[in-house]
Amino acid sequence: MSAFVSKYEDELIKTAKYIATPGRGILAADESTETIGKRFAGINVENTESNRQAYRELLFTSPGSYPCLSGVILFEETLYQKTSDGKPFVDLLMENGVIPGIKVDKGLVDLAGTNGETTTQGLDSLGARCQQYYEAGARFAKWRAFFKIGATEPSVLSIQEDARVLARYAIICQENGLVPIVEPEVLTGGSHDIKKCAAVTETVLAAVFKALNYHHVLLEGTLLKPNMVTPGSDSPKVAPELIAEYTVTALRRTVPPAIPGIVFLSGIQREEQATLNLNAMNKLDVLKPWTLTFSFGGALQQSAIKAWAGKPENVAKAQAKFLTRCKANKDATLGKYTGWASGDSAAFENLVVIGYRY
């Protein structure tokens, strides 16, 4: 089917293409107040607005990080915050060639008729909110759906419902000038092997792109944020080269070349692990018609937040840690990462957040 023709069509295509610039990626700094609170608890920092502002300012003002980043995903609170000297975060990012984006979903609700599966809420007010976010300076958005692997999961109902919701979100964003990042995440929890994850990922992605087509979404003005294909978290680990092979194969079977970029989520992967996997994908010698880059949260921030520990005197040290991960992932998007950033023990720390619920 033909894509919807929006008055923003040219801008959407230009923005999506820019975000997918080879050698650059996205910092996902859109943790909810509850989630950032759990990360702060791990470093004994109180979860206040001023501390959240200080931490985001640390990230956004890190010297040398801008050439590694094409976009930053913000939480709604952060979209309207300013630096300590009064400059809006949005202006700071744009002046340095980094496009601001915004998380627009409203979290998960249980999907009735399933075995504990979920769907994502927030469509009712989305159009009006997108207009407000565009006026505030955001130029792309993110919406996540979760798919768990179990004996009978993900169910057909879950796949079809979340694919429909992702497509509705995407077209509403495009009608209001925001590039949609479509994020169908197959969760890593479980003891399944990599082949099972690959099969589920392919099924989910096929359903998502079918729904995007039905809803006339402009693929050239859309970005995909999928999981990497890995074994379950309770299964034996495998080499980055195998993860790369299964992930790229799943994408080649399901993702149209009209999509300009695939920006991987890192999930609960350790910093170094996520970087090595991304690097292996970009080194893989097969046709990949899209840019393969990163949209990492914890896998860009773990070393930095630990070094910061809420203390102003640690800001420069934390920024140096953040820059190290930015440069490592920049190299990985080009298939040129050599492991030079693996010396920090925090790069290998478990990123599971106990009690986490999106």
From Swiss-Prot:
GO CC terms of this entry: cytosol
Gene3D superfamilies recorded: Aldolase class I
Molecular functions per Gene Ontology: fructose-bisphosphate aldolase activity
Name by which UniProt lists this protein: Fructose-bisphosphate aldolase 7, cytosolic
Record note on modification: S-glutathionylated at Cys-68 and Cys-173.
Residues annotated with N-acetylserine modification: 2
Function: Plays a key role in glycolysis and gluconeogenesis.
Active site per database record: 183, 225
